[in-house]
UniProtKB/Swiss-Prot annotation:
GO terms for molecular function: amino acid binding; ornithine carbamoyltransferase activity. Carbamoyl phosphate binds at residues 71-74, 98, 165-168, 330-331. InterPro entries: Asp/Orn_carbamoyltranf_P-bd, Asp/Orn_carbamoylTrfase, Asp/Orn_carbamoylTrfase_sf, Asp_carbamoyltransf_Asp/Orn-bd, Carbamoyltransferase_YgeW. Coiled coil: none annotated. This is Putative carbamoyltransferase YgeW. GO terms for biological process: arginine biosynthetic process via ornithine; citrulline biosynthetic process. Homotrimer. Keywords: Transferase. Its EC number is 2.1.3.-. Putative carbamoyltransferase. No activity can be detected with allantoin or 25 other related compounds, including 20 naturally occurring amino acids, N-acetyl-L-ornithine, N-succinyl-L-ornithine, L-ornithine, oxamate, beta-alanine and putrescine. Belongs to the aspartate/ornithine carbamoyltransferase superfamily. Contains a carbamoyl phosphate domain (CPD) and a second substrate domain (SSD), which are linked by two helices.
Length: 396
């Protein structure tokens, strides 16, 4: 049973959080209470909307989006989150701005933020650069606010970087909490974050890294599975190990999809490029070496093709707990015989869990909105209480 809005507000008010003083760039930088606050605020916003109560807390203001990579779900989730809160969206097209002519990050961050209350950034193409860029933007915003250039400090949200995809992993966690009933019920549950074959290369590391970095915070038994050579960023793996120790859960790495799926309660089969390949790709992209990139792609596709047996099939799902593990994916999945000839998951498995993955994705607008509210308001519980009391109809 999902909690009522009043119950969620009571829980939010009982938490110790400093999210109003910092940006949400990595989940493992936030305390357990701060993670719970985002989940609870998101759940309250979703419940208010379901009751036709407006969640518009801003009468004006901009939400800026900066997408340095393609996006469908996150782009529309961010736009939806801004709309939920009453903010208008403006996308920054860097190719059509003065950034293309050498304008500094410090200057751009201030120039776009005079009337901005939120900035969402996706920058996942270059290892070692995306999260660093977000922090540079954050520092520029801090300086602009401190110096009196900006009348308010915009909330900065990581819409995916080279290290983490916090809006995705938090939406995944919100869905798991809904599906299993509570965060407490996740303790001891086995989740298998596994590599899966894809006919494309260069998929970011941030989704699997986000999963192992977050689910290890809640006492879950997290298994990371991938073929030899498909490693993640070593520092993030260390974070997952330390998280598991602190939460009373476990974290282990295996090189067998079957072993990972065995008795799993949740499976998350998803392709990604090897860490070393992403490092090399970053160097080639920076050097604008098109021939080198073509050669690397050919090499990587051949490497992927050696592991077509890493495929989420009905037979593989039979290995899970009672053959009924929850299938998860950030979408779009590479569905064999549908979106590609051979991919991550069979049509049968995906179709069985298609609605579940859509419900998983449906949490993202509310998670993003919760991150923005938690940065802009020191007491989001009081704000939600006011919205509930006023009960302004969203649709008349």
């Amino acid at each position: 049973m999902m909690k009522t809005v009043n119950e969620l507000i009571k829980d939010i008010n009982s938490l110790t959080s400093h999210l109003h003083e910092k940006d949400f760039l990595l989940t493992w930088e936030q305390t357990p209470d701060e993670l719970k606050q985002v989940l609870d605020v998101a759940a309250a916003l979703k419940a208010l909307r379901a009751e036709n109560i407006s969640t518009k807390v801003f009468n004006s203001g901009l939400g800026i989006s900066v997408f340095r990579d393609n996006s469908t779900r996150t782009r529309f989730s961010y736009a939806s989150a801004l709309n939920l809160l009453g903010l208008a969206q403006q996308d920054l097209d860097e190719g059509k701005s003065q950034i293309a002519h050498g304008e500094t990050v410090r200057e751009t961050a201030n120039m776009i933020s005079f009337c901005a209350d939120a900035i969402g950034i996706r920058d996942d193409m270059y290892l070692g650069a995306g999260n660093a860029y977000m922090r540079e933007v954050g520092a520029a915003l801090d300086d602009g606010y401190k110096q009196g250039v900006l009348p308010q400090r915009p909330a900065l949200v990581n819409l995916q970087c080279d290290i983490d995809h916090p809006t995705q992993s938090m939406a995944d966690l919100a869905w798991l909490r809904e599906h299993f009933g509570s965060l407490e019920n996740l303790k001891g549950k086995k989740i298998a974050m596994t590599w899966a074959y894809s006919p494309s290369y260069g998929k970011p590391l941030s989704v699997p890294q986000g999963i192992i970095g977050l689910m290890t915070r809640f006492g879950m038994d997290v298994t990371l599975a991938h073929p030899e050579g498909y490693d993640l960023i070593p520092d993030v793996v260390e974070v997952a190990k330390n998280n598991a120790k602190a939460s009373g859960g476990s974290f282990r790495q295996v090189t067998s999809m079957e072993e990972a799926f065995k008795d799993a309660d949740i499976v998350y089969p998803k392709s990604w490029a090897p860490y070393k390949v992403m490092e090399e790709r970053t160097e080639l992209l920076r050097a604008n070496d098109h021939e080198g990139l073509k050669a690397l792609e050919k090499q990587c596709l051949a490497q992927n093709a050696q592991h077509k047996d890493w495929h989420c099939t009905e037979e593989m799902m039979e290995l899970t707990r009672d053959g009924e593990a929850l299938y998860m994916h950030c979408l779009p999945a590479d569905i064999s015989g549908v979106s590609c000839k051979e991919g991550e998951v069979t049509e049968g498995v995906f179709e069985k869990y298609r609605i579940a993955t859509y419900k998983e994705a449906s949490w993202k607008p509310y998670i993003i909105a919760a991150m923005i509210l938690s940065r802009k308001y020191a007491k989001p519980g009081a704000l939600l209480e006011q919205l509930l009391k006023e009960a302004q109809e969203r649709v008349k």
